UniProtKB/Swiss-Prot annotation:
Name of the protein this chain belongs to: Large ribosomal subunit protein bL33
InterPro entries with a match to the protein in the record: Ribosomal_bL33, Ribosomal_bL33_CS, Ribosomal_bL33_sf, Ribosomal_zn-bd
Species lineage: Bacteria, Pseudomonadati, Pseudomonadota, Betaproteobacteria, Nitrosomonadales
Family, per entry: Belongs to the bacterial ribosomal protein bL33 family.
Molecular functions per Gene Ontology: structural constituent of ribosome
Length: 51
């Protein structure tokens, strides 16, 4: 089953994206480069728990 996750910016701006992932197929934490509109550049987003 796909679970909801939060991708939080490593730039420290507080910006985040929400998405889903299959935890059985990909148990490791997701780390992806995406655009941060607050910092106005591409930064690394790391998976955190969605509360």
């Amino acid at each position: 089953m796909r679970e909801k996750i939060k991708l939080e910016s490593s730039a420290g701006t507080g910006h985040f994206y929400t998405t889903t992932k299959n935890k059985r197929a990909n148990p490791e934490k997701l780390e992806i480069k995406k655009f941060d509109p607050v910092a106005r550049k591409h930064v690394t987003y790391k998976e955190t728990k969605l509360k």
